[in-house]
């Protein structure tokens, strides 16, 4: 009779599962190779029964980083897989799945009985992904307990992600109350968007989000810092207690002023250095008047034009 817990039926979540798949198709083989290796402490799949008179099948063993439900394992590996809770050690399962010497996939390493794997697994994830965010998502408890050590390891490992792309820069200009911040909020998934704290140099809470919003900007970042943010080269930004790599693919700058007004012409050597980094200029249809959101619309300009008589994005 299926076990029940919290009103749910079916096998309880486990870390270690074995599975068999008879007569696998190429699509089914591909699916079994698709799950990211960061899911597993150890994963092995052998191909068996290819000689005449036997049923071709895949024989696999998965030791997941964290417990998985029966249905989740089916989702990862394929609905036709026959799945059971694993018995024996990782090494014994490795020997069983590889007994015919024809492996479809093997990743990770067999775990020993009682082996401490939380920190070592988090380290493996970190060195594989180069991302503290990935570690935090997959190993939250270990991340909280070992954040500083993991951060230092990332710095000295050479695995830290670095920007090697041009960050797109979108400037949204309009009077107060026209909906600039709403425009920025709707640009991308909130999960991947970081709102820069205003009027200071700190980037506390930034963890490599792909979209950065600099809201209500009027020149309060140092000129050189703004140019570096809007460029294409590796950059780290300061947090209270350390630095993090800047990995934004898009920067949204909202302002009541045009870029012409952000900095004094006597304070910057060549304002064109900023203009050529701007990807697009989005203006309220009449940015010189106090308008409500219902009374106008945002328009993407094609500079040089009357509203902004300088070339951009070159």
From Swiss-Prot:
Species this chain originates from: Porcine circovirus 2 (PCV2)
Catalytic activity: ATP + H2O = ADP + phosphate + H(+)
Domain comment, as recorded: There are 3 rolling circle replication (RCR) motifs. RCR-2 is probably involved in metal coordination. RCR-3 is required for phosphodiester bond cleavage for initiation of RCR.
Binding, ATP: 174-181
Cellular component terms per the entry's GO annotation: host cell nucleus
Protein name: Replication-associated protein
Motif (RCR-2): 57-59
Span of domain CRESS-DNA virus Rep endonuclease: 11-110
């Amino acid at each position: 009779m299926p076990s029940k817990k919290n009103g749910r039926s079916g096998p309880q979540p486990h870390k270690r599962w074995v599975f068999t798949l008879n007569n696998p198709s190429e699509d089914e083989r591909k699916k079994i190779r698709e799950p990211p290796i960061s899911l597993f402490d150890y994963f092995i799949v052998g191909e068996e029964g290819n000689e005449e008179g036997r049923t071709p099948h895949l024989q696999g063993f998965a030791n997941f980083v964290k417990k998985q439900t029966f249905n989740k394992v089916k989702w990862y590996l394929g609905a036709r897989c026959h799945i059971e809770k694993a018995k024996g050690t990782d090494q014994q399962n490795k020997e069983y799945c590889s007994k015919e010497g024809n492996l479809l996939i093997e990743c990770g390493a067999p775990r020993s009985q009682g082996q401490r794997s939380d920190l070592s697994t988090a380290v493996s994830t970190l060195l594989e992904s180069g991302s503290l965010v990935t570690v935090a998502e997959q190993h939250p408890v270990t991340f909280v307990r070992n954040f500083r050590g993991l951060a230092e390891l990332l710095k000295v490992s050479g695995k830290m992600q670095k920007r090697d792309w041009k960050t797109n820069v979108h400037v949204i200009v309009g009077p107060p109350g026209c909906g600039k911040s709403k425009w920025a909020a709707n640009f991308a998934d909130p999960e991947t968007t970081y709102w820069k704290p205003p009027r200071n140099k700190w980037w506390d809470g930034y963890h490599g989000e792909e979209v950065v919003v600099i809201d209500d900007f009027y020149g309060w970042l140092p000129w050189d810092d703004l140019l570096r943010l809007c460029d294409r080269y590796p950059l780290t930004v300061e947090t209270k207690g350390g630095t993090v790599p800047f990995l934004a693919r898009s920067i949204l700058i909202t302002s009541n002023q045009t870029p012409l007004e952000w900095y004094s012409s006597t304070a910057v050597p060549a304002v064109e250095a900023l203009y050529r980094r701007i990807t697009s200029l989005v203006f309220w249809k009449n940015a010189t008047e106090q308008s409500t959101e219902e009374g106008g619309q945002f328009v993407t300009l094609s500079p040089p034009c009357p509203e902004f008589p300088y070339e951009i994005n070159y």
